[in-house]
């Protein structure tokens, strides 16, 4: 059994990934925002009372001392999944963008995962087989950008990818991977997305639980295929 820390578990990919990992017998430490609808999450907690641990956390406003104290109740964290993210402003034309608003996307999609990873380093170091995964997007690939647009989302995810690459070089004993989960039917992905969140959760679980098939520092899609930077 692995102890798995996941951010943003109250909806979308985070919720179904949590559910899938619990069904597979793992223990999940999940974070959710105070202002989110947690009814489904509380029902899941009642189904897995011993293996689902929940804590309120906003990746934009992390109370470091509070999170550190909470984490001290766990011996180690084996897997960190930085899942929380936003698609801010969507595909607004460049000339209409409020450039200062980029900071919100950077705070959530880039700085949030960096802060969480930093705070969890001591607990990851106590694991016999630590691993770090970040939910990124193919839209963060510079080489794959053939249509432009989505400035804030692309920039923040490209920055996350670079953080992961540097981290993998500095901490070779902690494999670190960025994963593109595919276009998933969530509030962010919309109703026309071809992949259900349940299937996305299965795909991602298969990837993160077979670490020997992945090389640290790389950028993978949900099929385990390497994507271009």
Regions found by a protein language model. Give the residues of each.
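Structural signature of the Rossmann-like NAD(P)-dependent dehydrogenase/reductase core
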Residues: 6-7, 82-83, 130-137, 177-180
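N-terminal Rossmann NAD(P)H-binding glycine-rich loop of SDR-like oxidoreductase domains
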Residues: 10-20
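Conserved glycine-rich Rossmann-like NAD(P)H-binding loop of the short-chain dehydrogenase/reductase
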Residues: 24-39
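Rossmann-fold cofactor-recognition segment
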Residues: 45-62
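Conserved Rossmann-fold cofactor-binding substructure of NAD(P)-dependent oxidoreductases
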Residues: 58-75
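Catalytic loop of short-chain dehydrogenase/reductase
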Residues: 86, 90-106, 114, 125-169
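C-terminal helical subdomain
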Residues: 178-181, 190-229
């Amino acid at each position: 059994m692995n102890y798995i820390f996941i951010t943003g578990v109250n909806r979308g990919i985070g919720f179904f990934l949590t559910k899938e990992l619990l069904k597979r017998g793992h223990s999940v430490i999940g974070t959710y925002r105070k202002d989110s609808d947690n009814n489904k999450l509380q029902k899941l907690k009642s189904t897995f009372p011993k293996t689902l641990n929940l804590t309120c956390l906003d990746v934009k406003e992390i109370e470091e001392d509070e999170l550190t104290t909470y984490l001290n109740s766990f011996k180690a964290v084996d897997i960190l999944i930085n899942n929380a993210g936003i698609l801010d402003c969507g595909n607004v034309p460049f000339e209409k963008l409020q450039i200062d608003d980029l900071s919100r996307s950077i705070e959530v999609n880039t700085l949030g995962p960096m802060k969480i990873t930093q705070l969890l380093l001591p607990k990851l170091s106590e694991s016999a087989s630590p691993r770090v995964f970040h939910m990124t997007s193919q839209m963060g690939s510079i080489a794959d950008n053939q249509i432009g647009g989505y400035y804030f989302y692309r920039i923040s995810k490209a920055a996350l990818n670079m953080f992961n690459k540097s981290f993998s070089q500095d901490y070779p004993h902690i494999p670190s991977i960025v994963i593109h989960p595919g276009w998933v039917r969530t509030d962010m992905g919309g109703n026309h997305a071809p992949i259900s969140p349940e299937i996305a959760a299965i795909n991602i679980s298969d990837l993160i639980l077979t670490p020997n098939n992945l090389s640290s520092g790389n950028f993978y899609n949900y099929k385990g295929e390497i994507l271009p930077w």
